[in-house]
Amino acid sequence: MLTPKKVKFRKRQKGRLKGDALKGNNVAFGEIGLKVLEHGKLTSQQIEAARVAAMRHIKRGGKMWIRIFPDQPYTAKPLETRQGKGKGAPVGWYAPVKPGRVLYEIKGVNLELAREALTRAAHKLPVKTTIVVREGL
């Protein structure tokens, strides 16, 4: 799983996502990518599950880039606990994503195989996505 090595604060306020992605919204490394169409929070488990699904489809060919990193902690209170008594303990990490952000990129395999691999990865994610091809190909 993806986790930060060191953070300044253990817990964080939820906040709110507004607007579109200003950076990371173009295919930069690969030939084809998976782009988000709505706001969302992707946990490290979801990011890894999508990566595994795509890599199993393309097998040994090609290279894949993950363009997001889960650096925000999320907390949970124990089961059967009443409300109050402070914020729960950190249980995992998530990456906030805005519309337009490219999540994964693939290079080195034919476009149909890469398109199918990214479709399989998209099924593992809780947000709507689309497949984009790098301009000039």
Swiss-Prot record:
Belongs to the universal ribosomal protein uL16 family. GO terms for cellular component: cytosolic large ribosomal subunit. InterPro entries: Ribosomal_uL16 (IPR047873), Ribosomal_uL16_bact-type (IPR000114), Ribosomal_uL16_CS (IPR020798), Ribosomal_uL16_dom (IPR016180), Ribosomal_uL16_sf (IPR036920). One of its GO terms (molecular function) is structural constituent of ribosome. The keyword rRNA-binding applies. Keywords: Ribonucleoprotein, Ribosomal protein, RNA-binding, rRNA-binding, tRNA-binding. This is Large ribosomal subunit protein uL16. Part of the 50S ribosomal subunit. Binds 23S rRNA and is also seen to make contacts with the A and possibly P site tRNAs. Disulfide bonds: none annotated. The keyword Ribosomal protein applies. Pfam families: Ribosomal_L16. GO terms for biological process: translation. The gene is rplP. The lineage of its organism: Bacteria, Pseudomonadati, Thermodesulfobacteriota, Desulfovibrionia, Desulfovibrionales.
